[in-house]
């Protein structure tokens, strides 16, 4: 299966972080907007915004994001950033993407949570007008933030669903702030009406995956801690949960120490619902075409598998049922030409 074919396949992505996915030209433009001086060469700039192939840990990997934070402190910057990430996705035939971001990381200079979300939604709308893509936004609460901060963000976004905000996630330091410490916040999100996904099992603790299932959350990011957990995998499959897998990122952060310790094959063999995602296009120096190529190389993934994974993504997405029907039809049309 060639790179060209993999690029042409229609794709849906559920797990993509805004601040970790900005293109280098976009980073330069945003820095100019913020009067921030960057290294003159892309080779030097890449050292600041792309994590090493092997980092010490997830916490080490997350340090890369501090370089981007000052660039995303205005409505104009957030709007352009959202447009840029959706544009990148559209250029590799991603027909649906959910882009997630943490409002509080863009509130250093006076923006409110609703200001940040509205700006991102405007950028996604700009991209949708120009490209063949449906782009929606998720808000991330940060696990390490105070509950008061997160509750205030939830209050500010409660009425933004009609504008394209479709769901909520908790990201950040999962090891120090486990899922069972977020129960009151998760209940608050549920009362707001937003469906949820959670980063779960990225730090090696399978209990966080079980805790998510106990809370009725059926979409989870990473789930690398499923490896070797036969009973939990069985439960994950039986409860119709969906895995947002991020191979390159997990190898970088050592969430998976090797291909052999990545849970894909076990989950696939058990009939689990798998989706393939970039996590952070720039920080991990990847895109969906590259991720698909890795699955072909390491797992022998076939085109018919990619169709199923993308159908899983659309069905598990937080967009409307009518939008899902349209997207599923587009997927089938695209893949039919390769499966005949």
From Swiss-Prot:
A cellular component term, taken from the record's GO annotations: cytosol
The record's free-text note on cofactor binding: Binds 1 zinc ion per subunit.
GO biological process, one term: hypoxanthine salvage
Known catalytic reactions: adenosine + H2O + H(+) = inosine + NH4(+); 2'-deoxyadenosine + H2O + H(+) = 2'-deoxyinosine + NH4(+)
Pfam families: A_deaminase
Cofactor: Zn(2+)
Tagged with keyword Transferase: no
UniProt-annotated binding residues for Zn(2+): 15, 17, 199, 279
Enzyme class: hydrolase
Keyword flag Metal-binding: yes
Gene3D superfamilies linked: Metal-dependent hydrolases
E.C. number: 3.5.4.4
Active site, UniProt feature: 202 (proton donor)
Keywords on record: Hydrolase, Metal-binding, Nucleotide metabolism, Zinc
An example molecular function term from Gene Ontology annotations: zinc ion binding
Residues engaged in binding substrate: 17, 19, 172
Cross-referenced NCBIfam families: aden_deam
HAMAP family with a match to the protein in the record: A_deaminase
PANTHER family assigned to the protein according to its UniProt record, in alphabetical order: ADENOSINE DEAMINASE (PTHR11409:SF43)
Record's protein name: Adenosine deaminase
Species this chain originates from: Streptococcus agalactiae serotype V (strain ATCC BAA-611 / 2603 V/R)
Gene: add
């Amino acid at each position: 299966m060639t790179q060209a074919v993999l690029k042409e396949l229609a794709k849906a992505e559920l797990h993509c972080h805004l601040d970790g996915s900005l293109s280098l030209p976009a980073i330069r433009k945003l820095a100019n907007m913020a009067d921030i001086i960057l290294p003159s060469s892309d080779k030097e700039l890449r050292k600041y915004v792309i994590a090493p192939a092997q980092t010490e840990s997830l916490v080490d990997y997350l340090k890369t994001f501090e370089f981007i934070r000052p660039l995303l402190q205005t409505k104009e910057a957030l709007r352009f950033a959202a447009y840029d990430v959706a544009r990148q996705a559209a250029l590799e035939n991603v027909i649906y993407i959910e882009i997630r971001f943490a409002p509080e990381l863009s509130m250093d200079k006076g923006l409110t949570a609703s200001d940040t979300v509205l700006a991102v939604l405007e950028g996604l709308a700009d991209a949708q007008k120009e490209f063949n893509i449906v782009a929606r936004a998720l808000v991330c609460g940060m696990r390490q933030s105070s509950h008061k901060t997160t509750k205030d963000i939830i209050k500010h976004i409660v009425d933004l669903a009609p504008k394209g905000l479709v769901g909520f996630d908790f990201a950040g330091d999962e090891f120090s702030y486990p899922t069972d410490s977020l129960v009151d916040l998760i209940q608050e999100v549920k009362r707001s009406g937003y469906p949820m996904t959670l980063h779960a099992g990225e730090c090696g603790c399978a209990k966080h995956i079980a805790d998510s299932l106990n809370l009725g959350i059926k979409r989870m990011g990473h789930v690398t801690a499923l490896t070797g957990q036969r009973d939990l995998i069985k439960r994950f499959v039986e409860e119709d949960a969906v895995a947002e897998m991020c191979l390159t990122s997990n190898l970088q952060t050592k969430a998976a120490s090797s291909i052999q310790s990545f849970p894909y094959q076990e989950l696939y063999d058990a009939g689990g619902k798998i989706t393939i995602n970039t996590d952070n296009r720039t920080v991990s120096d990847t895109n969906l075409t590259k991720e698909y190529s890795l699955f072909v190389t390491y797992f022998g993934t076939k085109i018919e598998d990619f169709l199923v994974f993308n159908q899983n993504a659309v069905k598990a997405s937080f967009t409307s049922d009518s939008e899902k029907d349209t997207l599923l039809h587009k997927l089938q049309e695209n893949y039919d030409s390769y499966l005949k």
